[in-house]
């Protein structure tokens, strides 16, 4: 399978824009897949610059309902009139970032309600065909990131911590190889990997995901102890290659790289991979 990074916080090409967000294009023998749509429509311009025709996408997935992943969704729906977008049932929750200095809505734009006929609402594990499986409701809180603490769901007048019921992950299998795609891994990359292995019966061959080890609202990386513990878990897993970026953060990436070596790589906008 081919993977092209359409949007990420950094870029490796002068002709490709970057922004805080994530969007990936995945191509297999049977499917042309869009996974997340970045913070705005810039990922569409990037796709054109990279030779990716988004009008040919036949299926799309939204990893979760934060606007750095769904901000460009309406633009995609206007460009592509056929692809269904798979997302969790809880995407219409009221999701906020809450810090001592701000309380800001970061969820789905209400205008997207006009496109509900294009959406497929998912729950649990759903095998769509021999190539695609989406799963959610990841159990466990091992090595849970403190960067999640500022992410909240408004329920009535309260703002409890987000339980990430709106998060889902994707397994793509082709020619005996499987890649795991996660947006921010808010449920914890270690926990998500365990769920992926339970679904697959083995470890995926590659992982493309943000690891959420940096809090952009506070400008803080997770403590070294937590990052190192995540690195040890990933090193002990049988995944051949991890590709990360977006919400992982530069400090955490450097510490993980020291543990994982050539098994870990970055995935800036404009980069492409073959699994």
Language model feature labels by segment:
Residues 1-14, 149-161, 212-223:
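Glycine-rich phosphate-binding "P-loop"
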Residues 1-50, 163, 167-182:
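Conserved beta-strand hairpin/beta-sheet module of binuclear metal-dependent hydrolase folds
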Residues 10-13, 42, 140-144, 187-188, ...:
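Short, acidic Gly/Pro/Ser/Thr-rich loop/turn segments
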Residues 26, 36, 47, 64, ...:
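Divalent metal-coordination and catalytic microenvironments
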Residues 42-93, 194, 198-207:
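Active-site metal-binding motif and surrounding structural segment of the metallo-beta-lactamase
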Residues 50, 81, 115, 238, ...:
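Short, structured coil segments at secondary-structure junctions
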Residues 67-69, 163-169, 173-269:
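Cap/insert and terminal regions of metallo-dependent hydrolase folds
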Residues 91-168, 235, 265-275:
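Metallo-beta-lactamase
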């Amino acid at each position: 399978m081919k993977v092209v990074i359409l949007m990420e916080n950094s870029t490796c090409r002068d002709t490709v824009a970057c922004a805080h967000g994530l969007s990936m294009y995945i191509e297999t023998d049977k499917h042309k897949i869009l996974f997340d749509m970045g913070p705005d429509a810039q990922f569409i311009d990037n796709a054109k610059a990279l030779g990716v025709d988004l009008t040919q996408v036949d299926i799309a997935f939204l990893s979760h309902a934060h606007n750095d992943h769904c901000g460009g969704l309406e633009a995609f729906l206007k460009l592509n009139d056929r692809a269904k977008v798979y997302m969790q049932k809880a995407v219409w929750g009221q999701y906020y970032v809450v810090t001592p200095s701000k309380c800001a809505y970061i969820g789905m734009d209400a205008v997207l309600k006009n496109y509900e006929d294009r959406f497929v609402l998912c729950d649990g594990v759903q095998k769509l065909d021999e190539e695609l499986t989406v799963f959610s409701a990841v159990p466990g809180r091992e090595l849970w990131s403190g960067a999640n603490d500022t992410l909240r769901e408004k329920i009535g007048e309260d703002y409890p911590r987000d339980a990430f019921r709106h998060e889902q992950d994707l397994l793509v299998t082709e020619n005996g190889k499987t890649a795991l795609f996660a947006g921010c891994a808010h449920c914890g990359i270690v926990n998500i990997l365990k769920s992926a292995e339970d679904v697959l019966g083995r470890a995926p061959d590659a992982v493309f995901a943000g690891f959420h080890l940096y809090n952009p609202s506070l400008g803080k990386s997770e403590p070294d102890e937590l990052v190192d513990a995540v690195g040890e878990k990933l090193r002990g897993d049988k995944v051949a290659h991890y590709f990360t970026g977006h919400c992982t953060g530069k400090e955490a990436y450097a510490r993980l790289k020291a543990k994982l070596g050539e098994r870990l790589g970055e995935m800036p906008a404009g980069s492409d991979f073959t699994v």
